[in-house]
């Protein structure tokens, strides 16, 4: 073993790493926004907060991954949307606190650098950033032979946003009588996939199940997570929203109570929830108890808003999409979420 080839012989391809950087530059360039300083490849990404025009800025950050949905991306060899999932999981969390996303960083760890595949992953991250209005200002690609299988990789992201101090959404404004509005999800989004994979373990992904309205199973399972930023930001700017819940792991039961005080509860009319076909299929083929579905999945509502009754029509007008009045805030007696 010569010194020149020592790293390569240990399984790390430095040249492939350089190629990845060159391939992703054009995708990163798509995400440019006011405030970005410096060029890709520095030791740290820089952002000029004064360019946001926010008078009393509060930075709000979030980090997340996409769980075992990655395993389906690997199984079906489709890597161009999983990055959007990663961005969505982060920015939807910080928008729930009232933040406008400013910038994003990603982390990809793999056992073997495959430049074409990793370019697809980062292209998806960039697309998510464009949808969220966030700049992709840095990241890390780690080649770790022995830590992962040769075809495996993991993906995580980190989002930072800004809110006017007076417009932070922390649940303190939610009161009894507020209306709960549901914004539709694009599908399963990025949680519950350990169960999803078990339910469909014996399927190839090419199947067109009768519940899925003509779509292949793999298309539905890898449908990228919806990014709600551009829909919700105008509502925050007009201070029309009292609370926001991003419905992720733990479904309605765990996430909805995060947007209001402990003495309140959410009363939800199940008949008003726009349940998507994939959830009906999961319940049927997985033989999952109906009530448990609401403890795991978004059931068709990826983001829930608590809105004062007098603001409901204005919110609907600004959203300009199907909005579902699915419940209201009540005084808590026993449970924090009542599904009727």
Curated annotation (Swiss-Prot):
Superkingdom assignment: Bacteria
Cellular component per GO, a single term: cytosol
GO biological process: 'de novo' IMP biosynthetic process; adenine biosynthetic process
Functional pathway: Purine metabolism; IMP biosynthesis via de novo pathway; 5-amino-1-(5-phospho-D-ribosyl)imidazole from N(2)-formyl-N(1)-(5-phospho-D-ribosyl)glycinamide: step 2/2
Leader sequence segment: none
Name listed for the protein in its UniProt record: Phosphoribosylformylglycinamidine cyclo-ligase
Compartments, as annotated in UniProt: Cytoplasm
Pfam families, per database record: AIRS (PF00586), AIRS_C (PF02769)
Catalysed reaction equations from the record: 2-formamido-N(1)-(5-O-phospho-beta-D-ribosyl)acetamidine + ATP = 5-amino-1-(5-phospho-beta-D-ribosyl)imidazole + ADP + phosphate + H(+)
Main subcellular location: cytoplasm
């Amino acid at each position: 073993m010569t010194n020149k080839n020592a790293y390569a012989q240990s399984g790390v391809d430095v040249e492939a790493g350089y190629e990845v950087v060159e391939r992703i530059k054009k995708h990163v360039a798509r995400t440019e926004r006011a405030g970005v300083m410096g060029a890709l490849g520095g030791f740290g990404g820089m952002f000029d907060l004064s360019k946001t025009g926010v008078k009393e800025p509060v930075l709000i950050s979030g980090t997340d991954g996409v769980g075992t949905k990655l395993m389906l991306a690997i199984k079906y060899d489709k890597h161009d949307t999983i990055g959007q999932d990663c961005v969505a999981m982060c920015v939807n969390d910080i928008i729930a606190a009232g933040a406008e996303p400013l910038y994003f960083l990603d982390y990809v760890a793999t056992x073997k650098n495959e430049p074409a595949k990793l370019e697809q992953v980062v292209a998806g991250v960039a697309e998510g950033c464009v949808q969220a209005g966030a700049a992709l200002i840095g990241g890390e690609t780690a080649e770790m032979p022995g830590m992962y299988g040769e075809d495996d990789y993991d993906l995580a992201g980190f989002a930072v946003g800004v809110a006017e101090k007076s417009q932070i959404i922390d649940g303190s404004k939610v009161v009894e009588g507020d209306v709960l509005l549901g914004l539709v999800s694009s599908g399963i989004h990025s949680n519950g996939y350990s169960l999803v994979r078990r339910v469909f373990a014996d399927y190839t992904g090419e199947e067109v199940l009768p519940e899925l309205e003509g779509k292949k199973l793999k298309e539905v399972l890898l449908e990228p997570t919806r990014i709600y930023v551009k829909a919700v930001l105008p509502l925050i700017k007009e201070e029309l929203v009292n609370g926001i819940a991003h419905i992720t792991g733990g479904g309605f039961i765990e996430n909805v109570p995060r947007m209001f005080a402990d003495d309140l509860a959410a009363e939800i009319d199940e008949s008003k929830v726009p349940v998507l076909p994939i959830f009906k299929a999961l319940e049927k083929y997985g033989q999952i108890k109906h009530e448990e579905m609401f403890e795991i999945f978004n059931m068709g509502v990826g983001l829930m808003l608590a809105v004062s009754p007098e603001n409901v029509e204005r919110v609907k007008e600004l959203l300009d999409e199907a909005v579902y009045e699915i419940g209201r805030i009540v005084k808590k007696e026993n449970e924090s979420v009542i599904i009727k």
